[in-house]
C-alpha cells in the first residue's frame, strides 16, 4: 500500500510523538480492557484493532479483555428476554447466560481477533481456555439479593496466556469464569482485566470505556486514588 506525502508526514508525526512511550513499554505486557461505545461503531472498532496491531508491531505485548454489555442487551431484547440490574450487575439466569456465552465467547471474541489479524498482527480467541484461566465463584451482594449466574474472580491461572505472549500472539479474553461445579459465570470485565493485569504483573492497565473515570458517590471525577481509598466489591 502506497502513501502520499501528507499521509507520510502524519505517520512520521505520530511515531515521533509516540517514541518515548514505545521506548518505555518495549517488551512490556499491557492489559487493555475494551468496552463501551468503542465496541459498537465500525470506525472505532477498526481504529482499536489497528492501534493494538501497532502496539504489537513496535514491540509491546498487549492482552485484551473485552466486555459486551450493549451487544448482550440488544440480543436479549431481540429474544424477548427481560433484563434487570442490581448494583450495576446484570441479573443472569440460565436463559440469559446462554446468550451471554454466545455473544461474549463466540461473536465478540472472534470479531476482535479477526479485526486485529486484518491489520497484520497475530491474535487468538482464548474462550476455549477460560475454564482453566478464570476460576470464580458466585458473587453475593451484602443486600442478599440473588444475581443468578454472576461471578467474581477467585484466581487467575495465567499459563495459557503467557504461552501466547511468548509466541508473539495477542490473547483476546472474554469475562467468563467457571466455578468448582463447572458452572459458567458472567463477570464484570473491568474486574477480570484488573485481576489478569495483576497476575501477569502488567506494566500498565488501560480501561477503554465510555465512563470518564473513577468517580466518587456524588459523581465527581477522582484523578488520583491510593489503595486505602479504593474499595473493591
Can you annotate each of these PLM segments?
Residues 1-233:
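Nucleotide/pyrophosphate-binding catalytic subdomain
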Amino acid at each position: 500500500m502506497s502513501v502520499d506525502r501528507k499521509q507520510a508526514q502524519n505517520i512520521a508525526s505520530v511515531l515521533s510523538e509516540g517514541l518515548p512511550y514505545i521506548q518505555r513499554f518495549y517488551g512490556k505486557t499491557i492489559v487493555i480492557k475494551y468496552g463501551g461505545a468503542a465496541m459498537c461503531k465500525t470506525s472505532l472498532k477498526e481504529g482499536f484493532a489497528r492501534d493494538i496491531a501497532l502496539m504489537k508491531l513496535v514491540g509491546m505485548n498487549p492482552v485484551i479483555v473485552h466486555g459486551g454489555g450493549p451487544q448482550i442487551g440488544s440480543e436479549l431484547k431481540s429474544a424477548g428476554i427481560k433484563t434487570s440490574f442490581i448494583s450495576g450487575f446484570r441479573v443472569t439466569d440460565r436463559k440469559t447466560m446462554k446468550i451471554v456465552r454466545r455473544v461474549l465467547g463466540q461473536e465478540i471474541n472472534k470479531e476482535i481477533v479477526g479485526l486485529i489479524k486484518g491489520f497484520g498482527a497475530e491474535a487468538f480467541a482464548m474462550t476455549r481456555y477460560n475454564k482453566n484461566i478464570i476460576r470464580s465463584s458466585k458473587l453475593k451482594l451484602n443486600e442478599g439479593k440473588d444475581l443468578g449466574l454472576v461471578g467474581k474472580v477467585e484466581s487467575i491461572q495465567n499459563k495459557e496466556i503467557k504461552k501466547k505472549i511468548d509466541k508473539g500472539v495477542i490473547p483476546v479474553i472474554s469475562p467468563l469464569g467457571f466455578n468448582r461445579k463447572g458452572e459458567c459465570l458472567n463477570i464484570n470485565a473491568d474486574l477480570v482485566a484488573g485481576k489478569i493485569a495483576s497476575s501477569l504483573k502488567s506494566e500498565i492497565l488501560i480501561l477503554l470505556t465510555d465512563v470518564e473515570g473513577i468517580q466518587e458517590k456524588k459523581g465527581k471525577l477522582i484523578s488520583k486514588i491510593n489503595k486505602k481509598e479504593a474499595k473493591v466489591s
